[in-house]
UniProtKB/Swiss-Prot annotation:
Its cofactor is Mg(2+). Gene3D superfamilies: Divalent-metal-dependent TIM barrel enzymes. It is found in: Cytoplasm. This is Xylose isomerase. GO terms for cellular component: cytoplasm. It comes from Mesorhizobium japonicum (strain LMG 29417 / CECT 9101 / MAFF 303099).
Length: 441
């Protein structure tokens, strides 16, 4: 039954690349088979509840621009009735888009209670409402998470807070969110440390806070196993914003943290394009490194404005970048429990309800184009064959012996002298490889 928010709009369908209908897919055909799998099963699209339904359109210089029927009126109180209206519209949008998944924070979906118990009870109540909507629509939960960064209690961190009561409150909040995620058959649970870091070292015990973060994550992993949650625990790296320096800076930093606390086999990473850019990396770099380290899990797909210097969370539209990102994902074997979550929001001037649909349609089409280009590159060995040739020397008997530890430094030095080895540089052929990529996109 329609909420009326989107007007008289039918389910978005695939119309092909020649379509000029803004409310149709041009490249995303969910049933199209690419590399042996349906596009829907490759991409596993999810809609982010927070940007689409909770964000009011504000920025640091101005307040709310969006007028949504589920927002409390000026001076009004947020209620469970409004939360359920929001859910009605959300699931209507998921269905219109044909999006198989959604993601949420606890604070996105229920109003804050007068205390922890009331907040948890409200989360349970909306979870029951979600369960009915999920059964009705077939939409599934990709992941749940706790908002441990917006409320003022978390201004100095959650797991890394100097006050142990805040640590305890955060732990209780995460427990309630994991419980709900499990009840809704969520396939992952995400931890993002927006306030886990510091503004100045003058008031920060960095060593202590690292230990607190390690203990917190260990508690989460222990609880996952205790309750039989089969989903994947994911950490989402980000270098800064809102905190000046965040401890989950990038893939390499998080992997070192996981190794330190013996959790590298228990936790994987949810990697966001915009966060990679903030850390000074490309999206494909972070994906390739996570794959190399065995911790790739899921992605938040969006894009940043390259000139602004902050996390703009725009809908993705750079197909060449996305093709290289999905190439790394296919090289990792594709998504297991993860997927493509649109951690993207409208521009604050995009006021119309249809803008929500159009933003996601464009993002889904761009992802489909990127995935299909990546799949063709994999099938044709367009990049893997030159890469294998570049490193072919390591497949020689001597190359394998050096790498396996069968040669000492003295052995290697003696061979260089005896064989009169004088290596000659070889072209990296970067321009050729870039041109090859352009043939596919």
């Amino acid at each position: 039954m329609s909420s009326g928010f989107f007007g008289d709009i039918q389910k978005i369908k695939y119309e092909g690349p020649d379509s000029t209908n803004p409310l149709a897919y041009r490249f995303y055909n969910p049933d199209e088979v690419v590399a042996g799998k349906r596009l829907e099963d490759h991409l596993r699209f999810a809609v982010a509840y927070w940007h689409s339904f909770a964000w009011p359109g504000g920025d640091p210089f101005g307040g709310q621009t969006f007028d949504r029927p589920w927002f409390p009126k000026a001076g009004g109180i947020d209620t469970m009735e409004l939360a359920k209206l929001k859910a009605d519209v959300a699931f209507e949008m998921f269905s219109l888009l044909g999006a198989p998944y959604f993601c949420f924070h606890d604070a996105d979906v229920r109003p804050e209670g007068k205390d922890f118990s009331e907040s948890a009870a409200r989360l349970d109540e909306i979870a029951d409402y979600f369960a009915g909507k999920m059964k009705q629509t077939g939409v599934k939960l990709l992941w749940g998470t706790a908002n441990l960064f917006s409320h003022r209690r978390f201004m100095s961190g959650a797991a890394t807070n100097p006050d142990p009561d805040v640590f305890a409150y955060a732990a209780a909040t995460v427990k309630s969110c994991i419980d709900v995620t499990k009840r809704l058959k969520g396939e992952n649970y995400v931890l993002w440390g927006g306030r886990e870091g510091y503004e100045t070292l003058l008031n920060t015990d960095l060593a202590r806070e690292q230990e607190q973060a390690g203990r917190f994550l260990s508690l989460v992993v222990d609880y996952k196993h205790k309750i039989g949650f089969k989903g994947t625990i994911l950490i989402e790296p980000k270098p800064q914003e809102p905190t000046k320096h965040q401890y989950d800076y990038d893939v390499a930093t998080v992997y070192g943290f996981l190794k330190r606390f013996g959790l590298e086999k228990e936790v994987k990473l949810n990697i966001e394009q915009g966060h990679a850019i903030l850390a000074g990396h490309s999206f494909e770099h972070e994906l390739a490194l996570a794959n190399a380290l065995g911790v790739f899990g899921s992605i938040d797909m969006n894009r940043n404005d390259y000139q602004s210097g902050w996390d703009t969370d725009q809908f993705p539209n750079n197909v060449p970048e996305m093709a290289l990102a999905y190439y790394q994902i296919l090289q990792a074997g594709g998504f297991k429990t993860g997927g493509t979550n649109f951690d993207a929001k409208l521009r604050r001037q995009s006021l119309d309800p249809q803008d929500l649909l159009i933003g996601h349609i464009g993002g889904m089409d761009a992802c489909a184009r990127g995935l299909k280009a990546a799949a063709r590159m994999v099938e044709d060995k367009a990049l893997s064959a030159p890469l294998a040739e570049r490193y072919a020397g390591w497949n020689s008997a001597e190359g394998k012996a050096m790498l396996s530890g069968k040669r000492t430094l003295e052995d290697i030095a003696e061979r260089v002298v005896k064989k009169k080895i004088e290596p000659q540089p070889r072209s990296g052929r970067q321009e050729l490889l870039e041109n090859i990529v352009n043939r596919y996109v």
